[in-house]
Amino acid sequence: LRDAAMLELLYASGSRISELAALDVESISWSERTLRLWGKGSKERIVPLYRCALEATRTYIEEGRPELIAKAKRRDAENGPHPLFISARGNRMSAAMLRRRFHMLATLAGIPADIAPHAMRHTFATDLLEGGADLRSVQELLGHASLSTTQIYTHLTPDRLKRAVAQAHPRGE
């Protein structure tokens, strides 16, 4: 359950693995369907989440997380913060621990072991652009100060470029 929530949130939010490790249960607004991330330079950003990511995360919080705490023979803090991703020992998982889990899951799925969690961030940005999101919105979602940084994350396919010309150029047919 924890792994499913981790993968869903990585893809749904475009977060860095270090941002994911820093998440608390309180980082999620269920009513607003958003996730509060703290990026580089302690910059805060709020990212909307889709239903599948929320459901996977809720299931983990309600079923998987308490089980991990019980196995570790620990008690959850009364007044928070409540780390979202915890280890079998009941401690907050570090970015390195989450990265190892990611690599293990990739290997189990038959994906080359050299893939990095950061690939999910690239995929997030590319899929948004392919789906019609504007570059400025993607910049905000990724938490980039510079638009040129966001452009590095994008992988425009030849089909996307053809569609852009066909839709936007006066003679593009």
Spans of features found by a protein language model:
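Conserved catalytic core of the tyrosine transesterase superfamily
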Residues: 1-173
